[in-house]
Amino acid sequence: MASIARDIFKAYDIRGIVGKTLTDEAAYLIGKAIAAKAAEKGITRIALGRDGRLSGPELMEHIRRGFTDSGINVLNVGMVATPMLYFAAVNECGGSGVMITGSHNPPDYNGFKMMLGGDTLAGEAIQELLSIIEKDGFAAAGKQGSVTEKDISGEYLKHITGHIRLKRPMNIAIDAGNGVGGAFAGKLYKGLGNKVTELFCDVDGTFPNHHPDPSKPKNLQDLIAALKNGDAEIGLAFDGDADRLGVVTKDGNIIYPDRQLMLFAQDVLNRNPGAKVIFDVKSTRLLAPWIKEHGGKAIMEKTGHSFIKSAMKETGAPVAGEMSGHIFFKERWFGFDDGLYAGARLLEILSASDNPSEVLNNLPQSISTPELNIALPEGSNGHQVIDELAAKAEFEGATEIITIDGLRVEFPDGFGLMRASNTTPILVLRFEADTQEAIERIQNQFKAVIESNPNLIWPL
């Protein structure tokens, strides 16, 4: 029986520390396991790409060997943003592809995001890969698979610039946080006719300037400063593999993705009245009424890019988004999460206004916290911790308790959320309310619940 670290098999990707839990041997075995799943589905060709992390080339070589030793033909698209790998998978490989990326994890992490036959591997499908490895259930290869190399970037950029139409050229600033998006974002937005100020767009897997995670306000401070000190109208930021988008106004306001989705939903619903719009459990309580007001049907889903994608497939929703910054367009695009493309769609909408910051700042808003994190003790199961807390929790004045993903407690004047992260050993909390007094009241109720476990430290 092959041995592999079990804890790298997460809810919607595989992710671990390079050389410790995610070894070269693990990459090879994962390649063989994916090939076995592919063989079951009659898939013979898989697109393979990597982000800008230093461990990428070596992991790529080993997973590639796992594929070709199993008779799978590989389309190697090299260093790309995750959405570009998805683009190659959909257009060249029947929806099958593997992206080597650590997303926004620290530099010593890396991992794999996987699609087979148009379906994102998640949950049980990822556990099946582990089972194949542990039972040596690999497919018997006939002949060795081939490797074809292709630069997909030109086709990808052309596909976007071919259908996005700005009403006027804009002046924008972008911050790629030294992630792989920096290699392509400037070219894309200049190709749409904009003036672009580029921050940290050279790809550097050590992330020397700030972490490439636009969901954290501290990582947007350089972009905010560039907007205040320069002549750019709007700022766009990307995570390490550019499948997530951050947005900042001229006056330094961060427009979180749930508010971005208001604008995207309104735009899509103009052309698709009555359509469904999907959002995750972390999103503002102002989003569902906004979607309904603009003629759409609002659907709340559990957090995670693969869960959102499968919900889009099931419901036929043309647009979806989640609080971490993944925005998904099926209308005029392919349905996968794409920070670069979402940025282009945002500019298309904002270019109709002479004051884009005003358009963004006018979106409904209440008082809210960013994501708050509580570190879990080594070896503890976040979902189990949440279940234990929920079992003894009481929330006075709650109007609804939603349990699709952790515990989201609705009150007449706000909500509180606690859920287990699927990618890191933390609990994620978020609060929102109509007034500061209400948000503090809701937080205090959650604080009492959290502190009933002596191993958890309240983050505020």
UniProtKB/Swiss-Prot annotation:
Binding site for Mg(2+): S103, D239, D241, D243
Compartment(s): Cytoplasm
GO molecular function: magnesium ion binding; phosphoglucomutase activity
Annotated InterPro entries: A-D-PHexomutase_a/b/a-I, A-D-PHexomutase_a/b/a-I/II/III, A-D-PHexomutase_a/b/a-II, A-D-PHexomutase_a/b/a-III, A-D-PHexomutase_C, A-D-PHexomutase_C_sf, A-D-PHexomutase_CS, Alpha-D-phosphohexomutase_SF
GO cellular component: cytoplasm
Catalytic residue positions: S103 (phosphoserine intermediate)
EC number(s) stated in the UniProt entry for this protein: 5.4.2.2
Cofactor field: Mg(2+)
Biological process terms in GO annotation: glucose metabolic process
Annotated residues for binding of substrate: S103, H104, K113, D243, R244, T303, E322, M323, S324
Catalytically driven reaction(s): alpha-D-glucose 1-phosphate = alpha-D-glucose 6-phosphate
Swiss-Prot/TrEMBL keywords: Carbohydrate metabolism, Cytoplasm, Glucose metabolism, Isomerase, Magnesium, Metal-binding, Phosphoprotein
Pfam families: PGM_PMM_I, PGM_PMM_II, PGM_PMM_III, PGM_PMM_IV
Transport as UniProt keyword: no
Superkingdom, taxonomy of origin: Bacteria
Main subcellular localisation: cytoplasm
Cofactor note: Binds 1 Mg(2+) ion per subunit.
Gene3D superfamilies according to UniProt: Alpha-D-Glucose-1,6-Bisphosphate, subunit A, domain 3 (3.40.120.10), Alpha-D-phosphohexomutase, C-terminal domain (3.30.310.50)
PANTHER family: PHOSPHOMANNOMUTASE, PHOSPHOMANNOMUTASE_PHOSPHOGLUCOMUTASE
Family, similarity comment: Belongs to the phosphohexose mutase family.
Its job: This enzyme participates in both the breakdown and synthesis of glucose.
Protein name: Phosphoglucomutase
Native organism: Neisseria meningitidis serogroup B (strain ATCC BAA-335 / MC58)
Gene expressing this chain: pgm
